[in-house]
Amino acid sequence: MKVSRRAFIKQTAAAATASVAGVTLPAGAANLVTDKELTQLKWSKAPCRFCGTGCGVEVAVKDNRVVATQGDPKAEVNRGLNCVKGYFLSKIMYGKDRLTQPLLRMKNGKYDKNGEFTPVTWDRAFDEMAMQFKRVIKEKGPTAVGMFGSGQWTVFEGYAAVKLMKAGFRSNNLDPNARHCMASAVAGFMRTFGMDEPMGCYDDFEVADAFVLWGSNMAEMHPILWSRVTDRRLSAPKTKVAVLSTFTHRSFDLADIPIVFTPQADLAMLNYIANYIITNKKVNTDFVNKHTVFKQGVTDIGYGLRPDNPVQKAAKNADKVGDSKPISFDEFAKFVSTYDLDYTTKLANPDKSKEKEFKQQLQKLAELYADPKIKVVSFWTMGFNQHTRGTWANNMIYNLHLLTGKIATPGNSPFSLTGQPSACGTAREVGTFSHRLPADMVVTNPKHREEAEHIWKLPAGTIPEKPGYHAVLQNRMLKDGKLNAYWVQVNNNMQAGANINEEGYPGYRNPANFIVVSDVYPTVTALAADLILPSAMWVEKEGAYGNAERRTQFWHQLVDAPGEARSDLWQLVEFSKRFKVEEVWPEDLIAKKPELRGKTLYDVLYRNGNVDRFPLKDVDPEYNNAEAKAFGFYLQKGLFEEYASFGRGHGHDLAPFDDYHKARGLRWPVVNGKETRWRYKEGSDPYVKAGTGYQFYGNPDGKAVIFALPYEAPPEVPDKEYPFWLSTGRVLEHWHSGSMTRRVPELYRAFPNAVCFMHPEDANALGLRRGVEVEVISRRGKMRTRIETRGRNQPPKGLVFVPWFDASQLINKVTLDATCPISLQTDFKKCAVKIVKV
């Protein structure tokens, strides 16, 4: 029986889906798994390569090639289901333009900034790279070198990068692209609870009475989680779904309470709901009195723009953005009382002809939170986080759950959804941000630096105390010539970063700078670099991701990378061999540990008795491990166990390394072999003391903070010259910049190019028809696309939406590089543009 690969994928996926639904498939489908040809495949588990949901997949390998994938029925997250991107996982590694050897810009046999990309050996690539890094460190010091990493790094890669940059090069100029997606969530968690990441888990979905989406199109961005929400809504008819967004999208199809609002006005609506809860006497007084305190945050904090920007200069408190002062409950109640229904509607309603309907929906939404009998899960993603007041928005959604006590119990959860597969596990938990260390530690805290130096066996004072350049600032410093040696891994910031014409591309092509990009395909970012390093991806290496519900998942290396491609982990560790401590550390630091003199950073960081303590025999003999073979010890296990020591006993407990290869992921803290589903609640969280009920132990007093924060306008709004709001985002078929999904023929054909979604009346007013080519123009740049007046996304009048997956249509030429001043996360959801027919 011969079965085509396409038919096999389709039928096995159908079988997995059917088994979850309790459906029996025809014999032809069921018999596939017993076919002789198919039994030659080796199946192994792995988490999906795409979003932060953390779906489990089964991966089939034959002849050192991934030939099929299907949803893993044993995975708790997705229960055998895949979205359309996960369905085509087997194809993402095999694009025709896969990078397989290092490429250096050269002219006449030498490196030249303006030369052509030329194939070179790894030795030649690292020779040039090391020379450039050493030159910069010698001339300008460690603050002139930097790295931009990723929420797609494995846990091991991110941890190795933290050690290399913050300890080896003594530079905190390390930031992940998670700065663009999750920094506001992190800052919100830390300000309210003193600890990062959600207190709930996906198990909330099956017992909640209401779901509220704030700036989250789960139907397309988290479709597997949306299937669970949909199942709950349809199987429990009393369940309600509210969807709030600046435009109508596919998630609205399930909405009982649909609300389209004016950009930035979510701040006002959040305060209105808090006011509604208080005025209707629905505050959970016992919970609030025992477990919360109230603070008022500093206002008028600016927008993270360059200091000479007039809007930034006008801010009164740009130098104390995170400050706050204690207030009472009565003072908080008075503060939010301004946000009554009329005032909030005036700020938030984009369609004045539907004012009555808007008010009705807003009241229904407020009642979901206020009614003590209704268990509520709030979801949000980029609508909250990519926001010039993103940290505030996160704090304010917690206000609603804390005022009502709807938190940390099954079905009651404020749930920040993650965009990348390991934005939680790597960027946040490992601490690859410019101000962080592992397990919520920060470089500004002397005790935290001391702890890290102790674990890493380094001399006191190795880790700098000043935070480094964050993502947006890195681009500005590259342009200004203050950041000169720069390594980019697992991201495509030239397509993703805002205002790229003015603040991105100039820095990459600055003659004083040497830019290295490690990637699997020739992305926009790679083509702007001076050296391209070919990387292994996904199951071409052993890895670990941490998903949105604190679930850490491992996988084995299943196939070899093509050609000379090497994992980012191998690149980081191998590169460290080219630096002796004398070349990167001052003499007074070496004098504190003279036994390190003459050693390489590889010796100091990765052969320190911790990382190299697990021998090759610990590697599972059924699987290859390229890094273990290269370095002679089980590198991943050593890195993980050293990293895990930061969090064990501190509320971030991870299980022993080997447990993860056996399980379909475990949710931390894992104490005495048991994972934690709900944090901060007695009886569920082992860190909560008996008799306390709840304990928000990230804060010294064990209490969560309810913040009084106002509505503040965005830095740029539509006017006569630029009359439209621009919002950017993703679509179901593509992930981030499309560098993987656009190389899958089926996904490319499903949505080949980006378009400008526009209200039909706006299009008619401009004399535009569907399919007409236009320019989207802002004060910073312009790009060409085509108008779409139908389909899945339906903006209100006055707003356009353009997805950013298309490398041929760089919408980030247009966007504004304003940030939340607290989280330093970019606001990609609002700026002013005009639309002009070509």
UniProtKB/Swiss-Prot annotation:
It catalyses: 2 Fe(II)-[cytochrome] + nitrate + 2 H(+) = 2 Fe(III)-[cytochrome] + nitrite + H2O. Its main location: periplasm. GO terms for molecular function: 4 iron, 4 sulfur cluster binding; electron transfer activity; iron ion binding; molybdenum ion binding; molybdopterin cofactor binding; nitrate reductase (cytochrome) activity. [4Fe-4S] cluster binds at residues 48, 51, 55, 83. GO terms for biological process: cellular respiration; Mo-molybdopterin cofactor biosynthetic process; nitrate assimilation. Binds 1 [4Fe-4S] cluster. Substrate binds at residue 804. Residues 1-29 form the signal peptide. The keyword Ligase does not apply. Mo-bis(molybdopterin guanine dinucleotide) binds at residues 85, 152, 177, 181, 214-221, 245-249, 382, 386, 492, 518-519, 541, 568, 728-737, 812, 829. Gene3D superfamilies: 2.40.40.20, 3.30.200.210, 3.40.50.740, Dimethylsulfoxide Reductase, domain 2. It is an enzyme of class 1 (oxidoreductase). GO terms for cellular component: membrane; nitrate reductase complex; periplasmic space. Residues 41-97 form the 4Fe-4S Mo/W bis-MGD-type domain. The keyword Transport applies. It comes from the Bacteria. Keywords: 4Fe-4S, Electron transport, Iron, Iron-sulfur, Metal-binding, Molybdenum, Nitrate assimilation, Oxidoreductase, Periplasm, Signal, Transport. Predicted to be exported by the Tat system. The position of the signal peptide cleavage has not been experimentally proven. NCBIfam families: NAPA, PRK13532.1. Belongs to the prokaryotic molybdopterin-containing oxidoreductase family. NasA/NapA/NarB subfamily. This is Periplasmic nitrate reductase. It comes from Ralstonia pickettii (strain 12J). The gene is napA.
